[in-house]
């Protein structure tokens, strides 16, 4: 499924990174992901980012340790630097099984952070004269109504603002997270973040890119003035995007 105006991938030889999300959700997708990893390993990439949801939110998958351990082993096959963003299926949605989402997030950090600790999922680095930043913003209304949301979003918004200040003297800012903040409910868990993104679009027009997953609909568009949004493929499609490291010309 496509939405917006998808851009062509950068030509071979152009410095690039890989991004994917919302997979694998089945054993079929596990096999397809292995083949996709082989494909990425055959290319020169600065790094690879998975924007979260590495299984369904069932006890047999992303809410269970065994599935997460298998994904840890699978992702270890990626020869490039690999960054994983937490998705709602791995922690915040696990309340439907009577599990503590904060405990599940701690387990995720233990397995997937290089140095486990509070907020270790928030990473930031500079490549190609752009600042890249990861945010823990899960889908399914951002875990709205749970007491963890307020403190987490305070950290998220501070981290994003610090990153934006760094990016002002560079070519741009790339934000990577799981949730699609433009899919709103009557009680909106993304309102304050969306306002912050709108302000960044005004402040750095054409220099801010948001990459997310969540709604499994491939998009490349401008949902807010000055903000480019890329949504990656998701289950049942097991695909990745090759994106240029350097900022594209203003669209």
Segments predicted by a language model, with ranges:
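Bacterial N-terminal signal peptides
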Residues: 1-3
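Residue-level signal for short, function-critical loop segments
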Residues: 23, 88, 138, 179, ...
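Extended active-site neighborhood of metal-dependent phosphoesterases/phosphodiesterases
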Residues: 59-158, 196, 203, 217-248
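Active-site neighborhood of phospho(di)ester-bond hydrolases with catalytic His/Asp-centered motifs
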Residues: 19-22, 47-53, 81-87, 175-178, ...
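N-terminal active-site segment of His-dependent metallophosphoesterases
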Residues: 5-65, 162
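His/acidic metal-ligating clusters that form di-metal
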Residues: 10-11, 38-47, 76-77, 126, ...
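A short, flexible beta-alpha/helix-coil linker loop
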Residues: 54-57, 139-142, 180-183
């Amino acid at each position: 499924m496509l939405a917006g105006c998808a851009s062509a991938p950068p030509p071979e030889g152009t410095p690039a990174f890989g991004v994917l999300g919302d997979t694998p959700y089945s054993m079929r997708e596990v096999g397809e992901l292995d083949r996709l990893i082989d494909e990425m390993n055959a290319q020169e990439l600065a790094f690879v980012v998975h924007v979260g949801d590495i299984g369904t939110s069932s006890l047999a998958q992303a809410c269970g340790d065994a599935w997460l351990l298998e994904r840890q082993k699978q992702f270890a096959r990626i020869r490039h630097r690999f960054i994983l963003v937490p998705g709602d299926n791995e922690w915040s949605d696990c309340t439907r099984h009577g599990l503590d989402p904060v405990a599940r997030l701690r387990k995720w950090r233990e397995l997937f952070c290089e140095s486990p600790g509070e907020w270790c999922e928030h990473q930031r680095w500079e490549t190609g004269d752009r600042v890249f930043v990861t945010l823990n913003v899960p889908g399914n209304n951002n875990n709205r109504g749970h007491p963890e949301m307020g403190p987490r979003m305070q950290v998220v918004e501070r981290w994003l603002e610090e990153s934006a200040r760094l990016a002002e003297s560079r070519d741009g800012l790339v934000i990577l997270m799981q949730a699609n903040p433009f899919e709103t409910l009557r009680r909106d868990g993304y309102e304050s973040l969306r306002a912050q993104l709108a302000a960044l679009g005004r402040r750095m027009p054409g220099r801010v890119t948001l990459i997310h997953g969540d709604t499994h609909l491939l998009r490349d568009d401008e949902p807010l003035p000055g903000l480019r949004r890329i949504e990656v493929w998701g289950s049942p499609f097991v695909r990745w995007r090759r994106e240029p490291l350097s900022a594209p010309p203003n669209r």
